[in-house]
Amino acid sequence: MSVNEQKKQLRKALLQKRKLLCDSETAVKNAAITENLLSLEKVRTADIILPFVSTDGEVDTREFITQCLKAGKNVAVPRCIDGSNMEFCVIHTFDDLEKGMYGIDEPKKSCAVIDAAGAENSVLIVPALCFNAKGFRLGYGKGYYDRFINGYKGY
């Protein structure tokens, strides 16, 4: 079996396992993750926070985004611009979002695009199905974040 086939099977198994989590367990885990992120010095001192907007059972990033906005942080979230790339756009509220490619909430066209890859004092929050002990991630298979991370200069 090829590596790509193994990844595909692992993605399927992880998505099924994630669906089995009960709402109360998910809420507790989401709150803990949000609290942990907000306590990180890199997050507290970053000029720009680059989170993903959660969907379909992912770790809920909306409370994290809300707290960052309340703290006066610059928050920019991704928008898919074609079949393989994304750009980050500044948002001020969740009203700045609309359904985009793949049915995921993305910034409206009116939101300012920033050079997120070149933003050295920034923190990128990356979606994943899992990470291994060495920090390697398994995403959803489209490669958007893999391509972005290659040129990213922040944390």
Short names for language-model regions:
Residues P107-C111, P127, G151:
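Mid-sequence acidic-hydrophobic segments that form the walls
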Residues S2-E120:
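N-terminal active-site beta-alpha-beta segment that forms phosphate/nucleotide-binding
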Residues V113, G118-N121, V126-L138:
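Well-ordered alpha/beta subsegment
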Residues A128, K134-Y155:
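Membrane-associated lipid acylation/remodeling enzymes share a hydrophobic transmembrane-juxtamembrane segment
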